[in-house]
Amino acid sequence: MSNYTTCTEDAAAVRAALKAKGLGRKHVSVRSDQYSMGSSLRIRVLDPAVRIADVRAIAETKERISRDQFGEILSGSNRFVFVEYDYTVEKVLAASWLSRVETAIAQVSGNSIVPVEGTPYGVAVNAYGAHSLWDISSEVGGHIQGGEAHTLAYSIGARLGLAPEAV
């Protein structure tokens, strides 16, 4: 007996697992695509209160990617899983953190990283005036992303969910 499941069956299993966690069609959209050399599951989070990490943990159990000894992806029968926020949710997440990011940006001077209140992240401005988001939670930390304030705010929201006062 084979353990192979179709992409449609995997999509149904993901929907059932999400539903068991209380996440239905109003919270998460699950779509399956099949094509000549593989298939994919596309999961879009439709509710800003849903943590994408929780959805990703369920969905990525269905991912199957065959690789050679060098790590290159082999053609055929791969199942890719994509989990992302819906665009409307991205805007809500960014808006919930924007004031904190703007406050931190206003405090940056010289070669410093200013913490964003309530997060393990900080913002900096380089010599050319561009903003960037940094992980300041550990010694290892590092650069996460550059961009305008709303882009950095969305990046925080994608990692942490809604800001506490927005919940």
Predicted regions and their residues:
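Charged, low-complexity surface segments at secondary-structure and domain boundaries
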Residues: M1-S2, I43-V45, E84-T88
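Amphipathic, interaction-prone secondary-structure segments
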Residues: A11, R15-I52
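Short, surface-exposed ligand-recognition loops at beta-strand->loop->(often short) alpha-helix junctions
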Residues: N3-D10
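Intrinsically disordered, low-complexity regulatory regions enriched in serine/threonine/proline
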Residues: R51-V167
